Swiss-Prot record:
NCBIfam families: MarP_fam_protase. Its main location: membrane. Residues 193-384 form the Peptidase S1 domain. One of its GO terms (biological process) is symbiont-mediated evasion of host immune response. One of its GO terms (cellular component) is peptidoglycan-based cell wall. Its EC number is 3.4.21.-. One of its GO terms (molecular function) is serine-type endopeptidase activity. Keywords: Autocatalytic cleavage, Disulfide bond, Hydrolase, Membrane, Protease, Transmembrane, Transmembrane helix. This is Serine protease Rv3671c.
Length: 397
């Protein structure tokens, strides 16, 4: 059996025990328990950022946040059950007690499944625990709960998921969707010395954005697409009011003239930018093709990362703000180690042509990255001539 199946069995077992408790507690006790779970989870999500912000280790931060939420959820549920049982004791009529018990079973099942879902959601964004994230993402039971959850309820764990997303990259897939992984050979390490890397390096720039509303400095990569124009990811400049492009070691002030959070693409106007533009490939890449990711991982030095195309797919998932309404994009999945800071960088073929724009990495598979295809971003090229500044929306998290 898979870890996901064991997780489903565990959740259903706890739900069965909860159903017995619901029979004894009755409808009111179970409803109060449900209210206690929601209040406990909400309190945990509100308190967690202030408490775990003092913890530097990502793994310790994850488990500290989950322990806090679990403790408050348990306190809320127990308080609700105790209050409910006190009221139930006043019901003497046997038929009414029977109806009360049946309703209690149903409500208590909802309580436990909701609590399990609330605790599992942050784990789907934990890059520090890829095996655990994979098990949670593969859970059929939790996936059904996620489908049934109302939009307002999904905002409760969303804040904590953003806090615990240590990858620095926005979620690409729905919380309980597994990354599609087509097996391909390991990338060729010799690609870093291919002459095409040195030839394209000047046109790949580092981007630093100041987002004072969320007290963040955002770092990513971009590349020249026409004279004085740079393409990058929207999440690299989200919420910013000051953007600087670095060509080599020289800084250039930039203005965001196009911002699309659905596709996750932004275009920057950068006057007097000297590097020449890169050219987009006319033909799509095939599975197994040698390719290279160019970027500034971690906001550090220019790095060429060997990669290999897994497949080209139509991928459905959230936009950069995690909107519940999914967007569908043409994407390459690649075998490569994509890191924070690579966002917005080009994926090039061995002719130096751009196959797409890097925009994410898989949580449940450390060797898989996501790239918007050249065809997907082609529509954005119509905005190259824009000159007026546009808004950059809210901060991503």
């Amino acid at each position: 059996m898979t870890p996901s199946q064991w997780l489903d069995i565990a959740v259903l077992a706890v739900a069965f025990i909860a159903a017995i408790s619901g029979w004894r507690a009755g409808a009111l006790g179970s409803m109060l328990s449900f209210g206690g779970v929601l209040l406990g989870a909400t309190a945990g999500v509100l308190l967690a950022p202030h408490i775990v912000s003092q913890i530097s280790a990502p793994r310790a931060k994850l488990f500290a946040a989950l322990f806090l939420i679990l403790a408050l959820v348990v306190v809320g549920e127990v308080a609700g059950v105790v209050l409910g049982r006190a009221v139930r004791g006043a019901i003497r009529n046997r038929p009414i007690r029977l109806i009360d018990s049946v309703i209690g079973v149903g409500v208590q099942l909802v309580v436990v499944l909701t609590a399990a879902w609330l605790l599992a959601m942050p784990l789907t964004q934990s890059k520090e625990q890829p095996e655990l994230a994979a098990a949670v993402k593969g859970s059929r039971v939790l996936a059904r709960v996620n489908e049934a959850a109302p939009t307002w309820l999904k905002t409760v764990p969303k804040r904590l998921s953003a806090l615990l997303n240590t990858s620095g990259l926005p979620a690409v897939l729905e919380p309980f969707s597994r990354t599609p992984v087509i097996p391909v050979a390991s990338p060729d390490p010799a690609l870093v010395n291919n002459p095409v890397v040195a030839a394209t390096e000047p046109s790949v720039v580092k981007i630093r954005s100041l987002a004072p509303r969320c007290q963040k400095v955002l770092e990513g990569t971009g590349f020249v697409i026409s004279p004085d124009r740079v393409m990058t990811n929207a999440h690299v400049v989200a919420g910013s009011n000051n953007v600087t492009v670095y060509a080599g070691d020289k800084p250039f002030e930039a203005t965001v003239v196009s911002y699309d959070p659905s596709v996750d693409v932004a275009i920057l106007a950068v006057p007097h930018l000297p590097p020449p533009p890169l050219v987009f490939a006319a033909e799509p890449a095939k599975t197994g093709a040698d390719v290279v990711v160019l970027g500034y991982p971690g906001g550090g030095n220019f790095t060429a990362t060997p990669a290999r195309i897994r497949e080209a797919i139509r991928l459905s998932g959230p936009d950069i703000y995690g909107d519940p309404e999914p967007v569908t994009r043409d994407v390459y999945t690649i075998r490569a180690d994509v890191e924070q800071g690579d966002s917005g960088g080009p994926l090039i073929d061995l002719n130096g042509q751009v196959l797409g724009v890097v925009f994410g990495a898989a949580i449940d598979d450390a060797e898989t990255g996501f790239v918007l295809t050249a065809g997907e971003v082609a529509g954005q090229l119509a905005k190259i001539g824009a000159t007026q500044p546009v808004g950059t929306g809210a901060c991503v998290s």
